[in-house]
Amino acid sequence: MQSWPMPTIPSVPGKPAVLSLFDTSDQLIKPVEVDTPEVGVYVCGITPYDSTHLGHAATYLTFDLINRQLIDAGHRVHFVQNITDVDEPLFERALRDGVDWRELGSSQIDLFRSDMENLSVIPPRHYVGAMESIPEVIAMVETMLANGTAYIVESDSYRDIYASITATTQFGYESHYSRELMEQFFAERGGDPERVGKKDSLDALIWRAHRLGEPSWDAPFGAGRPGWHVECSAIATHHLGSHFAIQGGGSDLIFPHHEFSAAHAEATFGESRMAGHYVHTGMIGLDGTKMSKSLGNLVFVSRLTSEGYHPSDIRLGVFAGHYRDDRDWSTDLLTAAQERRQAWITAADNARDVQQVQQTIQKIRHLLANDLNTPAVLAEVDNWANLIPLNDSARTEAGRLMASGLDALLGVKI
């Protein structure tokens, strides 16, 4: 599937910093694995049945920052992202709206691409739909059936295939959730704990046998379509190998989605751990209330840009909080971001001290390298801007250097 255009990323002089991120599994901040020719990064994409909202944007802007820090340090990044373009939420929305689910998915994918391009997000090298990856999913399911880590439910007319939670001895190492919490989230987040014939209520669907009216693909074990978790597992390992540096997404994906997608890969390839880092972003609320489709309080990126808000202001609004924190979005936050960027523009237009700018850029690098400490980064640039005296001449080398640094490291244009 086609991605979106690559933004221009300026080259910035200075010494890059070693990126360290909080790992959900190990529960600590540690250096990212960069000892391979390419740093593999897999980020879970959208299910394309609605526009890109601020919750989506906050996640993808976080991983854009990670990409930018790795690129700044001279690493080649192999960035892969999926699209869950065949799934129940898409079918349900298409049925509600009286449109073909393929047409709905295609239109929302186009809008997502546009939003990411407007936000200057670095595109994935491989932007992959679930429907494109059926052969890889089938191969993974076949392997799991053959090695006994998956089984066919025989209790009714539908021969669905499930992966056992006992497929790996380390299941649960990513989330560290209790059995009770796993059962709660499994039921709330697309699981089917009541399915008759499963060996364990937490066993995850990896192949849904064909039902009348649903899309399906032929497979040696019967026609059907992939389960949610195995799609990401197959796509990630096909493009990045059985072990790679970072798997990421929102904190609502920790369980069951990321726990199971890692477990499926580990059961297939015999790895003890699919990713070196499991990185998760906090949830975004609106004016003190959790942002959700059911509440109808989503803030869409396309709506903000159509109303005239600059994409860099959206980025600054998101970066005002730390990526791992659950945080709030508001009109006041966006207004403050606009005012902040304008102050930076004014400072860049008046800056004359190149050494001062170089020192500030180095501080930005080190703050970002320490688990993407964006609130401290914004405060550091504010401090620099407040020191700049006003004059009436054109932007000079110092201002151009600061503009390049903010563009390269934050994706913010001034």
UniProtKB/Swiss-Prot annotation:
Catalytic activity: 1D-myo-inositol 2-amino-2-deoxy-alpha-D-glucopyranoside + L-cysteine + ATP = 1D-myo-inositol 2-(L-cysteinylamino)-2-deoxy-alpha-D-glucopyranoside + AMP + diphosphate + H(+)
SUPFAM superfamilies: Nucleotidylyl transferase (SSF52374)
Keywords assigned: ATP-binding, Ligase, Metal-binding, Nucleotide-binding, Zinc
Gene Ontology annotations of biological process type: cysteinyl-tRNA aminoacylation; mycothiol biosynthetic process
Single Gene Ontology MF annotation: ATP binding
Xref: InterPro entries: Cys-tRNA/MSH_ligase, Mycothiol_ligase_MshC, Rossmann-like_a/b/a_fold, tRNA-synt_1_cat_dom
E.C. number: 6.3.1.13
GO cellular component term, pick one: cytosol
Domain of life: Bacteria
Function: Catalyzes the ATP-dependent condensation of GlcN-Ins and L-cysteine to form L-Cys-GlcN-Ins.
Name this protein carries in UniProt: L-cysteine:1D-myo-inositol 2-amino-2-deoxy-alpha-D-glucopyranoside ligase
Organism: Corynebacterium diphtheriae (strain ATCC 700971 / NCTC 13129 / Biotype gravis)
